[in-house]
Amino acid sequence: MRIGGVEVTKFASEMMSSSSSSAVEMLNLKEASNWWSDVNESPIWQDRIFHVLAVLYGIVSLVAVIQLVRIQLRVPEYGWTTQKVFHFLNFVVNGVRAVVFVFRRNVQFMQPEILQHILLDIPSLAFFTTYALLVLFWAEIYYQARAVSTDGLRPSFFTINAVVYVVQIALWLVLWWKPVRVMVILSKMFFAGVSLFAALGFLLYGGRLFLMLQRFPVESKGRRKKLQEVGYVTTICFTCFLIRCIMMCFAAFDEGANLDVLDHPILNFIYYLLVEILPSSLVLFILRKLPPKRGITQYHQIR
């Protein structure tokens, strides 16, 4: 009987310990939830987080323009090359984002409301154009290596970008004329589709170029570096555009995932860090190598 009593006591003790652990976990979850809500609802924390984003974007923009100047000093005899345009667009996109986040609270109260959507969405469109340019560059290299004509690539690049901008402008105009929830959903879903298209572009041409480079001997250090460069950039850009696509789908239908409001600063910080700041920083670092001086090798120039 004493043994039975010990077992009952032990069982009761374990139950109390388990209940106590569950209570502690629930309390921790509640505290975490309260912390998240407190930060989201605090104007001071909202401004701090938005200003941190502004600083980070400013740093990326500064790095891009420094790299642009270095390239210009290295090969001043060339005009606007693909590499120069890529760094210039990075400078512009990140610079505009920095300014928007510095004045994020003012942007939120701009009237008419369509101006808010334009200021928050234009950098995203420019980001798409910037990295679509990288896809174009890789597609040209891939087809040139296979002795296939690349005459149709640049017109396709400009046509795709023109269609994206025209459709987005049309959505803005309709949203201005009739600001209903359905139009906001359509706008976000359209951009989710654009992001998915960009992700697939990186997967298609980055993957093709990577596989093509793999077939060549990789004894040379330069070719091995190029293989790593293409692999890393493809992975980074595919991932960031895929995350953007998924997040836009959530934001379209769930108010809790809305990024165009002041009271979601933590979500804004995580989102923009993952889909723009980190990818841009990593790509700029990976592509930091300066072009060869004139006479060493060919250099791709935008015509």
Curated annotation (Swiss-Prot):
Pfam families: THH1_TOM1-3_dom (PF06454). Disruption phenotype: When associated with TOM1 disruption, reduced efficiency of intracellular multiplication of tobamoviruses (e.g. crucifer strain TMV-Cg), characterized by a reduced accumulation of viral coat protein (CP) and reduced amplification of TMV-related RNAs. The keyword Membrane applies. It is found in: Vacuole membrane. It is a multi-pass membrane protein. The chain crosses the membrane at residues 49-69, 83-103, 118-138, 157-177, 184-204, 233-253, 266-286. Residues 1-48, 104-117, 178-183, 254-265 are extracellular. Residues 70-82, 139-156, 205-232, 287-303 are cytoplasmic. Keywords: Host-virus interaction, Membrane, Transmembrane, Transmembrane helix, Vacuole. One of its GO terms (biological process) is viral replication complex formation and maintenance. The keyword Transmembrane applies. One of its GO terms (cellular component) is plant-type vacuole membrane. PANTHER family: TOBAMOVIRUS MULTIPLICATION PROTEIN 1-LIKE ISOFORM X1, TOBAMOVIRUS MULTIPLICATION PROTEIN 3. Contributes to the intracellular multiplication of tobamoviruses, probably being a membrane anchor promoting the formation of the replication complex. Constituent of tobamovirus replication complex. Interacts with the helicase domain of tobamovirus-encoded replication proteins. Belongs to the plant tobamovirus multiplication TOM1 protein family. This is Tobamovirus multiplication protein 3. It comes from Arabidopsis thaliana.
